Amino acid sequence: MDLSPREKDKLLIFTAGLVAERRLARGVKLNYPEAMAYISAALLEGARDGQTVAELMHFGTTLLSREQVMEGVPEMIPEIQIEATFPDGTKLVTVHQPIA
């Protein structure tokens, strides 16, 4: 399989997001990289499913709560920016204060 660097990045985000999802399902609090991967993977999948940038900006704030992450993680993530592929091209999605 010959993947471009961008495709490799997306695959890495998805894989890390899947690990974070499994840990969350077991009740494990997520650390910084896991929280970033979990939210980023969900945003990429949402774009692939046809959600708009505005919908994803809101959706990104509903994925994790303070109770689901380790202490200090919400303050470490004031925003998340990710380039997602939409039906009409690639766009930057920015989610402010993703962990409420």
Curated annotation (Swiss-Prot):
Q: Which GO terms describe its biological process?
A: urea catabolic process
Reactions catalysed, semicolon-separated, are: urea + 2 H2O + H(+) = hydrogencarbonate + 2 NH4(+)
Please give an example of a GO cellular component term from this record: cytoplasm
Pfam families linked: Urease_gamma
Question: Which GO terms of the molecular function aspect are on file?
Answer: nickel cation binding; urease activity
Task: Tell me yes or no: is Hydrolase among this UniProt entry's keywords.
Answer: yes
Which family does the record assign? Belongs to the urease gamma subunit family.
For this entry, the protein name equals Urease subunit gamma
This protein's species is: Ectopseudomonas mendocina (strain ymp)
Lineage of producing organism: Bacteria, Pseudomonadati, Pseudomonadota, Gammaproteobacteria, Pseudomonadales
Per UniProt, what is the name of the gene that codes for the protein in this document? ureA
